[in-house]
Curated annotation (Swiss-Prot):
It catalyses: tRNA(Asp) + L-aspartate + ATP = L-aspartyl-tRNA(Asp) + AMP + diphosphate. L-aspartate binds at residues 220, 445, 486. It comes from the Bacteria. Its EC number is 6.1.1.12. Homodimer. HAMAP family: Asp_tRNA_synth_type1 (MF_00044). One of its GO terms (cellular component) is cytoplasm. This is Aspartate--tRNA ligase. GO terms for molecular function: aspartate-tRNA ligase activity; ATP binding; nucleic acid binding. The keyword Protein transport does not apply. It is found in: Cytoplasm.
C-alpha cells in the first residue's frame, strides 16, 4: 500500500505516530516560511504543515511547484494543531511533513473542485471525472451503494433470488420505442435492449423460482425531457402465489426498511387511494400529499348561470390558496399564462379574492352575487384572506390543469420541505386508454397486467371502464415504483391482445413464447419495479436523479464526455449490412 491511513481517519489519539497519506491537493497556503496543504481523498481532508527550520529545504523547494489537484504522497508525524478547525473531522491534528512525493501533476481544473463549485452543469458533465471528485457527488454515489446494499439484504431475507436476465432481446410492440441493436451474424435482423425484464421475470415464475429480484439496467428510446435518462436502473421484483394486498404489504415494509436503514427516517403507514380519487382530489395520479390545496368540485353550485365560461363545462373545480387574497394583478396574470401554456382547458383562470373584510373581488361578480360567492368559499373551505382559483372544461383536462397549478403554487409558496416524506399507494388504474392517433386501445401499463376479476366481462362491451390490478408507489409527488398482478391464463391474455388490436397471427409472432408457457402450469403471480435512481434522489433529498448516476446523459440524451452517440466507420456499417438514409 502506498499509504498507511486515509485523509479522513486521523484524530488526537494518533498524535506521535508516523503516517503516510496519499491524495489530491485541495488547497495550498504559502506564507513563505510556513506552508499548509489540504490533502483530500474520498474519506476526508487532512492538513499538512511544512515549516522552515523543521522541514527539509528540498521539500520546501518542491512544494513551490505543486498546484491544485496534484496527486501527492506525504509521510510525517501526527501533531496537534495549534488552531483547531471544529468543522473538520480531522481538525484537531495536522501532519508535520518529513517526505513528499509528487505522484502526478495536474492541469488547472476548468471549475472549482469543492463542496460548492462555479462550474455549469454541461461543463461539469463534460469533465464528469473531475466533478465526481467533489464530496457531494461522492456522497451521493455512496448513498446509492448503501440503498442497493439494504435493498438486497431485505429481499434476500425474504427469499428473493437474484437472477440476471438478458440485455439482447426481441423487440416487442407497445410502450416506448426500443433501442435496437443490429446483428452482424444475422444480417437485416435486430436485437432490442430491454425496457424492463418484464417477460423474463414472468417466465421465471412459470419456471417455479417463486421470488425473483434484480437491480436491472433498462433502456427506453423516449423523447427527451428534463431529468429523464435513456438508460436507468430498476429494482425489479416478481412473486408467485400472491395477491395485490400481499405485494403492497411486502413492499411497503421494504420501503420503510430502506428509509430507516439509510437515513434513519421512520415512515408511517402508507395511505391507499384509487386512481379516480387521486385525479379528483389532486389532478394527478402521482399526488404530493405533503400539503393540502385539494381540488374542490363546484359544478353543481355554479352551473346554472349566464357566465359563458361555465355554461358548457363538464367539470368546474378549483383550489383554495391560503392567505393569498393579496395576489397582485401581475401574479394572477402569470398564473393565467401558465394555464394557457398547458393547452388543456379553453376557459381562462377565474379568480375570487376573499378579502379580509369578508367581501369578494372577482371578475365574475357581475354573474354571481355575494351570497353565491359565499357558498363557493364555504365549499372550498376558504376564510377571509384566501384566494380561490377556478377552472372549467372537460373532466380529465380540468383536473390535470388544476393539479399542475397546485404544484406550481407549492413551489412558488415554498409549502413543503424536502425533509418530509409522504408516501402513498395509488390503485385501480384504468387497464386501457384510447389512442386517437392509432384509433385503438393501448395498455396503460403493459399488456400483461391483469384486469380486476369483477371487470373482465366489460372487456367485450366497455373496455375503457375496465380497472387494472395495478398499483403505484408515490412519494412526494414522484412515482417511485409500480407494478401489477399479471395475467397467467392463456385465454385471458389472448383476449387482451385482441382488445389491443393484435391479430391472432401478430400476437402469436410477438408473444407466442409467453402464451405457450402459460399452457405448462403458470402460477398466479405479480410484481413491482422501483425506479432505483429516483428512489436514491428522494432519499438524498434532491430534485434530480443525475447527481446519483456516475455518468449520466444530458437533457438531449448525449454523453458530452464521451461524445456519444456518434457516427461509426464505413467498415462497421458495411459489416452490419445497414444502409443509412441521407
Amino acid at each position: 500500500m502506498l499509504r498507511t491511513h486515509t485523509c479522513g481517519e486521523l484524530r488526537l489519539q494518533h498524535i506521535g505516530i508516523s503516517v503516510t497519506l496519499c491524495g489530491w491537493v485541495q488547497k495550498i497556503r504559502n506564507k513563505g516560511s510556513l506552508v499548509w496543504i489540504d490533502l483530500r481523498d474520498r474519506y476526508g481532508i487532512t492538513q499538512l504543515i511544512l515549516e522552515e527550520h523543521i522541514t527539509a529545504p528540498e521539500i520546501l523547494s518542491q512544494v513551490q511547484h505543486i498546484g491544485r489537484e496534484y496527486v501527492i504522497q506525504a509521510t510525517g508525524s501526527v501533531i496537534e494543531r495549534s488552531a483547531k478547525n471544529p468543522s473538520m473531522p480531522t481538525g484537531d491534528i495536522e501532519i508535520e511533513v518529513k517526505s513528499l512525493t509528487i505522484l502526478n501533476t495536474a492541469k488547472t481544473p476548468p471549475f472549482l473542485i469543492e463542496e460548492q463549485t462555479d462550474g455549469g452543469e454541461e461543463l461539469r458533465m463534460q469533465y464528469r471525472y473531475l466533478d465526481l471528485r467533489r464530496p457531494p457527488l461522492q456522497k451521493n454515489l455512496l448513498l446509492r451503494q448503501l440503498v442497493a446494499q439494504h435493498a438486497r439484504a431485505y429481499l434476500e431475507q425474504h427469499h428473493f433470488v437474484d437472477v440476471e436476465t438478458p440485455l439482447l432481446i426481441k423487440s416487442t410492440p407497445g410502450g416506448a420505442r426500443d433501442f435496437v441493436v443490429p446483428s452482424r451474424i444475422h444480417p437485416q435482423q435486430f436485437y432490442a435492449l430491454p425496457q424492463s425484464p418484464q417477460i423474463f421475470k414472468q417466465l421465471l415464475m412459470v419456471a417455479g423460482l417463486d421470488r425473483y429480484y434484480q437491480i436491472a439496467k433498462c433502456f427506453r428510446d423516449e423523447d427527451f425531457r428534463a431529468d429523464r435518462q435513456p438508460e436507468f436502473t430498476q429494482i425489479d421484483c416478481e412473486l408467485s402465489f400472491v395477491t395485490q394486498a400481499d405485494i403492497l404489504h411486502i413492499f411497503e415494509n421494504f420501503t420503510k426498511y430502506i428509509f430507516e436503514a439509510t437515513i434513519q427516517v421512520r415512515l408511517d403507514k402508507f395511505p391507499c387511494i384509487t386512481y379516480a380519487e387521486a385525479m379528483q382530489k389532486y389532478g394527478t395520479d402521482k399526488p404530493d400529499i405533503r400539503f393540502g390545496m385539494r381540488l374542490i368540485e363546484l359544478t353543481e353550485l355554479v352551473k346554472n348561470s349566464e357566465f359563458p365560461l361555465f355554461k358548457q363545462a363538464k367539470l368546474i373545480a378549483g383550489i383554495c390558496v391560503k392567505g393569498c387574497a393579496d395576489y397582485t394583478r401581475k401574479q394572477l396574470d402569470d398564473l393565467t399564462e401558465y394555464i394557457k401554456k398547458l393547452n388543456l382547458v379553453t376557459s381562462g383562470l377565474v379568480y375570487v379574492k376573499y378579502l379580509a373584510d369578508g367581501s369578494f373581488n372577482s371578475p365574475v361578480s357581475k354573474f354571481y352575487d355575494v351570497e353565491q360567492l359565499t357558498l363557493w368559499a364555504k365549499q372550498m373551505h376558504a376564510v377571509p384572506g384566501d384566494l380561490l382559483l377556478i377552472l372549467a372544461g372537460e373532466i380529465e383536462a380540468t383536473q390535470i390543469a388544476l393539479g399542475s397549478l397546485r404544484l406550481k403554487l407549492r413551489d412558488e409558496l415554498h409549502l413543503v420541505s424536502k425533509d418530509k416524506f409522504a408516501p402513498l399507494w395509488v390503485v385501480d388504474f384504468p387497464l386501457l386508454e384510447w389512442n386517437e392517433e392509432s384509433q385503438r386501445y393501448v395498455s396503460r401499463h403493459h399488456p400483461f397486467t391483469s384486469p380486476k376479476q369483477e371487470d373482465i366481462e366489460l372487456l367485450s362491451t366497455k373496455p375503457e371502464t375496465v380497472r387494472a390490478n395495478a398499483y403505484d408507489l408515490v412519494i412526494n409527488g414522484m412515482e417511485i415504483g409500480g407494478g401489477s398482478i399479471r395475467i397467467h391464463d392463456r385465454a385471458l391474455q389472448e383476449q387482451i391482445f385482441n382488445v389491443l388490436g393484435f391479430s391472432e397471427e401478430e400476437a402469436r409472432q410477438q408473444f407466442g413464447f409467453l402464451t405457450d408457457a402459460f399452457e405448462y402450469g403458470a402460477p398466479p403471480h405479480g410484481g413491482i419495479a422501483f425506479g432505483f435512481d429516483r428512489l436514491c434522489a428522494i432519499i438524498g433529498r434532491e430534485d434530480s436523479i443525475r447527481p446519483f448516476i456516475a455518468f449520466p446523459k444530458n437533457n438531449a440524451g448525449r454523453d458530452v464526455m464521451m461524445k456519444a452517440p456518434s457516427t461509426i466507420t464505413e467498415q462497421q456499417i458495411s459489416e452490419l449490412g445497414i444502409i443509412l438514409s441521407k
